[in-house]
């Protein structure tokens, strides 16, 4: 036990016997004195209840923090208030991460770290229970895992073995990463297949797919991810000076309001345009519109496909796109991003959708600007369907 831990235990022990210092003082006071003691105790309980309410309000304030100066100022004050809380509040702060905004989550994790450094010795068993509670926030559980296993590699390895199928993406990533690091030079195919099935992070999926291929195994990487490979596309339509991101062209109105007609023609940027079907062969699922539309600039293309479900289900639509984009599913807007050439990555934009049984129509509007720099020539997207953990959900009509 180090000096800090001993000091904390001393503080706990001191806090458990506060009346020892005052026993003699009250011995001869009589009934009136005991009434005063009772009143003070009652006031203390009321004070604790008031502080508990204040802490809950502070946590709620942090949960709602947005990226604005006023919101951040309120968050700083709430965080300062929580940093003086009693040990048990740490668990409530961790629980609060589940319903927090991304900014609020950062504040809450910072407060939790401060409280842990101060009070962890009192709460280890409760933190262990929190870690194993899969209904809690995945990032919060990973924080607790890091705290509890710091400097204890054997314990870390032992615990990670149980997290390869965990709903916490952070814990799962750490567990799969450790398993990959410990693979033999010639790992068994069954082991690689199992790890690939358990993996959710794109980099780990790519690593395991490569190892399987090196071992002679055929891997459909696009299928593992759940990329949609075949699309009906039409364009180009005008986007001169980026003015038409919000323009509802007749094709857009028809896509959202009418059954799809592949023979329909429309007036495009430079004349009449019609639908064409394209299928990407890329393992990354990238659909290259620049190639299909002769590197047109200041232009818009619409893409649509059908995702068939056996039964209704909640899914996530995950788009990677370096251009401005809008996405609809069954005529309902899922998200919109008017951003050009700010980077592209798998799962860049994620929207939750309730798919119906049968055919579900997915529509994209992909807008290219008129920049001439070499890095601004890409006009492409990749889209996949997954569950909430990132595991591919495959269409019946794939």
List the model feature ranges, each with a label.
Residues 1-25:
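N-terminal secretory signal peptides that target proteins for export/translocation
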Residues 49, 53-65, 86-97, 120-132, ...:
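Amphipathic alpha-helical scaffolding segments comprising HEAT/armadillo-like alpha-solenoid repeats
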Residues 70-71, 100-101, 136-137, 167-168, ...:
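Short inter-helical turns and helix N-cap capping residues of alpha-solenoid HEAT/ARM repeat scaffolds
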Residues 73-85, 95, 106-118, 129, ...:
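Structural detector for internal amphipathic alpha-helices that build alpha-solenoid repeat scaffolds
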Residues 197-286, 365-398:
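Accessory carbohydrate-binding/adhesion or oligomerization-edge regions at the termini
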Residues 290-295, 304-307, 350-354:
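Beta-strand-rich interaction surfaces with strong enrichment in secreted/lumenal proteins
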Residues 309, 314-328, 362:
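Aromatic-lined ligand-binding clefts that engage carbohydrates, nucleic acids, or primary amines
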Residues 329-379:
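Beta-strand-rich ligand-recognition modules
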């Amino acid at each position: 036990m180090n000096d800090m831990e001993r000091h904390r235990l001393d503080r706990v022990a001191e806090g458990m016997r506060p009346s020892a210092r005052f026993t003699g003082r009250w011995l001869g006071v009589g009934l009136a004195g005991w009434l005063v003691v009772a009143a003070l105790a009652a006031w203390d309980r009321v004070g604790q209840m008031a502080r508990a309410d204040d802490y809950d309000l502070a946590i709620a304030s942090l949960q709602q923090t947005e990226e604005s100066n006023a919101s951040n100022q309120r968050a700083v004050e709430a965080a300062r208030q929580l940093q003086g809380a009693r040990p048990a509040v740490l668990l409530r702060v961790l629980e609060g991460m589940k319903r927090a905004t991304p900014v609020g989550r950062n504040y809450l994790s910072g407060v939790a770290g401060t409280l842990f450094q101060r009070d962890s010795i009192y709460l280890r068993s409760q933190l262990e229970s929190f870690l194993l509670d899969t209904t809690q926030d995945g990032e919060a559980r990973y924080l607790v895992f890091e705290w509890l296993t710091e400097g204890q590699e054997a314990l870390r390895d032992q615990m990670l073995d149980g997290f390869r199928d965990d709903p916490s993406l952070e814990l799962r990533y750490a567990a799969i990463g450790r398993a990959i690091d410990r693979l033999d030079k010639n790992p068994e195919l069954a082991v690689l297949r199992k790890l690939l099935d358990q993996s959710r992070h794109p980099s780990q999926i790519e690593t395991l797919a490569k190892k399987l291929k090196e071992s002679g195994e055929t891997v459909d990487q696009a299928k593992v991810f759940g990329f949609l490979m075949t699309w009906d596309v039409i364009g180009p339509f005008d986007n001169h000076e980026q003015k038409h991101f919000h323009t509802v062209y007749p094709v857009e109105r028809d896509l959202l309001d009418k059954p799809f007609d592949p023979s329909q023609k429309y007036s495009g940027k430079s004349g009449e345009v019609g639908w064409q079907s394209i299928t990407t062969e890329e393992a990354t699922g990238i659909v290259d519109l620049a190639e299909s539309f002769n590197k047109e600039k200041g232009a818009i293309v619409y893409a649509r496909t059908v995702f068939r479900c056996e039964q209704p289900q909640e899914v996530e639509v995950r788009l990677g796109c370096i251009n401005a984009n809008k996405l609809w599913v069954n005529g309902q807007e899922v998200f919109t991003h008017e951003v050009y050439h700010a980077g592209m990555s798998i799962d860049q934009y994620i929207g939750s959708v309730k798919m119906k049984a049968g055919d579900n129509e997915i529509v994209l509007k992909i807008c290219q600007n008129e920049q001439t720099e070499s890095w601004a020539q890409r006009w492409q997207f990749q889209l996949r369907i997954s569950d909430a953990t990132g595991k591919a959900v495959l269409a019946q009509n794939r």
